[in-house]
Amino acid sequence: MKLKKTVVTTVVVAAMTVLAGCQSVPEARQQSVIEQLSSVSMLRQDNIAGAYEVAVAPGVDSVFVAAVPAFEPNSGGVVQRLDPRSLQVVQSIQLPRRSFALGFNPTSSTLYVGNTLDGSLTVIDATNGAVRGMIQLGERVVDGKGQVSAPHTRKVVVDPLRNQIFVTSPDSEGLVWIVDGATNKVRHTVETNGPWPAGAAFDRANNRLYVGQGGLNEVVVINPENGEIVNTLSTGDTTSADPKESKHFFVNMAIDEKNQRLFAADANTGSVYVFDLGNGKVVQIVPVGEGLLDIAYSEQRNEILATNRGVSRGSPAGTGSLTVIDGTNYSVNRRVDLPVHPNSVALSANGQTAYVTVKVPHGNDHPAWRKDAQDSIVRIDLQGG
């Protein structure tokens, strides 16, 4: 099968910068440029320092990006609100703690920000960007040098129907916190009996949380009502209880609720594992590439979208892409090159548009490294071919 391959350049539309800084340009002309950008099938803006996860919030006509501009002690985070059409930053929400993960409740218009290094959630009113509060999930400990540590958070998944939030904590003995969105209190703390619980996907109809990790049972199934593990799924490939012997690490997951399929992004092998939730068996393995990271499922298109960073310890100089997989036969429909390192992917409510954050190289040993380069947000019309 011949794949269609699309290359996205890192060039930011110069007209946007000119219009933003030149007050003499007529407003009508500026609006015309914005409308033109809104209609293109693919748009990239290199305008975010330290971008991580992206979330789409159609109820407030916004795309949010969690960002960590700096990692110095006591540095904070930023959540950038973007126009979903032009990808222009329309609001910057400063936070006292660094922001990595995002979960959105469309019913209450509440944005939950995962403060990974602090073991907490910041609660934001998505209608105006006001910070409503902070939920401390893991105990913060101060050592003799005054350094603060806490169990890290990872994925934030929201169930708007029951107003509950799920947060994974990837440690050698991992946890999942289940939070009541009405009270902002932790209802249950679940031990997953496995290392590094990271990815998570929620089945709304059956009220079941699927959590991906390493170890013997790469997926645990949790009943949020009582916080109990009711089932586990395994590839059967790992035979030792030693976490170092884990063959897989399901770093992110997505679910097809209608057809009861679970898609797991395996960071160890660079492949997507497809589980039949009816029998708990792996029905397909789809190779994607090195540095496989995030995954999303478009029910409307019956397509699986996966980002891979394109690098590994053995191949540190690569670049990544977004892979679009056919949900019927699991063939690759399309690869979209997104240099340098694609990170998080989220879908519009109608499943026809993808938003992807793309990170610059971490160090100057990468050939694409440039001083003061900014991370990016990319909008892709999946109907555009």
Question: Residue spans of the language-model regions?
Answer:
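Gram-negative bacterial Sec-dependent N-terminal signal peptides
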Residues: M1-Q23
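Predominantly soluble domains enriched in secretory-pathway, periplasmic, or organellar proteins
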Residues: V18-G385
